């Protein structure tokens, strides 16, 4: 039986945030969820998440499944106390127990598997991951001989000589559950912080081993925003390298971000300052950016987007967007359509070869194929209480500076006169003009 305990009860005061530390995000996922995802690669029988500070928020953030359980640690008196609380709540202490913090988001499932294998090979009571750091500031120091641990001292309790030791405790343990259960509740808070340290279990167990790995960055804990930023950079580099090896060009990778969930096809060019978030999918031969933000959007082949923002929409093949377009949620823009500068579209469906080239707002609208929307066109869809739809048929031409007062239905091949305010439906093949007759006053002088 394999049990995992993730320690997520702390406040994270050094983050200087009202949000619990484990709920800060890296590339769209919370620190805690990243640790859970890595632990799930072990296929554990149960995962216990030890919560405390703002426990409801932490619980609500987790993607639930049947093997995840929550235990409240109150008050929070250290890592050893957290496992004491766990031990009192869990009736069976069989097999192995993995204990790790919820703020090590880069830890790999493969590394945890290696820890378990090492633990089994040594028939250990406890094995913990260690590594040598050039700058070990903030970490407890491990003192071992032939991988047998002699002592672990938290940095706060180290003297200057002990601080010179570079072998650190990564805070990731594999325990023999039965061995741990016999001694866990005997640990006391005999330290400057008046906390119960899990590391004190090392002295009470007979076979305590150091599993040393190279410092490749995955053991980085997060205690402040600087460390959060460094981890974000690490994750982003891995994501972008994967896409580049798969056939994507980044003009300036350092200025771009891509979510892990996003899918990008071959021969896509991502220009500088472009950010692709959420569950976005970009198909082959697209050009994206510069200065573009895309979230939860499907972009089909041969599209070009420049200096624009797109949320939760679908673009079919050969669509051109931008510069300075804003495509809001629930839009579908069909093939060979063109959305130009300073155009906002929301909750609308545009059929093939529709052109909205500049300075327009199209909301809650359906536009037929081959229709041209002139500059300055506005669909006035809100009456102060409700949103109303606009329907424009095929092969229509909406004149510049037209206002369409919804609800309204324009048929196929309808033309509106420039500067019109259209309030009534228009039938197929009609011309709609709604503006006052021009009056010229001769010999006019300003006062």
From Swiss-Prot:
Native species: Prochlorococcus marinus (strain MIT 9515)
Cellular component terms (Gene Ontology): carboxysome; cytoplasm; membrane
Alphabetical list of Gene3D superfamilies matching this protein: Hexapeptide repeat proteins, Spore Coat Polysaccharide Biosynthesis Protein SpsA, Chain A
Catalytic activity, EC: 2.7.7.23, 2.3.1.157
HAMAP family in UniProt: GlmU (MF_01631)
Gene name for this UniProt entry: glmU
Cofactor binding remark: Binds 1 Mg(2+) ion per subunit.
Catalytic activity: alpha-D-glucosamine 1-phosphate + acetyl-CoA = N-acetyl-alpha-D-glucosamine 1-phosphate + CoA + H(+); N-acetyl-alpha-D-glucosamine 1-phosphate + UTP + H(+) = UDP-N-acetyl-alpha-D-glucosamine + diphosphate
Name of protein: Bifunctional protein GlmU
Region (Linker): 226-246
Keywords: Acyltransferase, Cell shape, Cell wall biogenesis/degradation, Cytoplasm, Magnesium, Metal-binding, Multifunctional enzyme, Nucleotidyltransferase, Peptidoglycan synthesis, Repeat, Transferase
Pathway annotation from the record: Nucleotide-sugar biosynthesis; UDP-N-acetyl-alpha-D-glucosamine biosynthesis; N-acetyl-alpha-D-glucosamine 1-phosphate from alpha-D-glucosamine 6-phosphate (route II): step 2/2; Nucleotide-sugar biosynthesis; UDP-N-acetyl-alpha-D-glucosamine biosynthesis; UDP-N-acetyl-alpha-D-glucosamine from N-acetyl-alpha-D-glucosamine 1-phosphate: step 1/1; Bacterial outer membrane biogenesis; LPS lipid A biosynthesis
Cited PANTHER family: BIFUNCTIONAL PROTEIN GLMU, NUCLEOTIDYL TRANSFERASE
Requisite cofactors: Mg(2+)
